[in-house]
Amino acid sequence: MSAALTMRRFALPALLAAAALAAGCAKETTRYGDARGVETVTNQFGSTDLQMIAESMARSMLKAPAIVSGNLPIVTVQEVRNKTSEYIDTRAITDSIRAELQKGGKVRFAVDASGMTQQTDEIKRQSSEYYNREQAVEKGQMVGAEYRLEGNITSIVKRVEDIKDVYYKVNLQLWNVRNGLLEWSDEKEIRKTTTRG
């Protein structure tokens, strides 16, 4: 076998192995960013929008007469409904609004519909023979909410040539559970425009 043929025979596999090794050794850099910084990667719903909505809505609701009455009203929070054409984690919006309201210290929260199964399962578990009856939570002790917070997020998307305009609107309402009266309502609007080119 000639030296040239042997060299050709091993050259391609050696070249592929070297390329794979070089790709595997490529340096990957990870850095921390400011979680509160403005996110401008895309014009889709993002972390900046989530923070702005939660803070704005909580600030507004904490000024509502039903809340400032001073008796720490009990609120249940329904998951914000997504009426946009894109996937938006509305549970994250709902949880962020609840967290901002909780920080305000003016409301208490009753278990919501999504958490009811876990709550009743825990009560049933404590009713088993494995728990001390004197310390176990009894059925019929849960507190009902005085108010129900609910809402939705909608969007309008327009495209013209290299311009994409996205308008989001989040609307929340606080309903009195006892009498069905609307106690508070507000909305937060966000507009994002992207130009290609």
Where do the language-model regions lie?
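Sec-dependent bacterial lipoprotein signal peptides
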Residues: 1-25
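Bacterial Sec signal peptide processing site at the extreme N-terminus
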Residues: 19-44, 196-197
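Amphipathic beta-strand/beta-sheet edge segments enriched in Tyr/Trp
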Residues: 26-29, 146-196
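N-proximal, solvent-exposed amphipathic alpha-helical segments enriched in charged/polar residues
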Residues: 44-62
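N-terminal segment of the mature soluble domain
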Residues: 56, 60-132, 179-185
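Surface-exposed acidic, glycine-flexible loop patches that form ligand/cofactor-binding
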Residues: 64-69, 139, 160-162
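A short, acidic, amphipathic alpha-helical segment used as a generic capping/interface helix at domain edges
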Residues: 131-139
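Extracellular/periplasmic catalytic domains that process cell-envelope and extracellular macromolecules
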Residues: 140-144
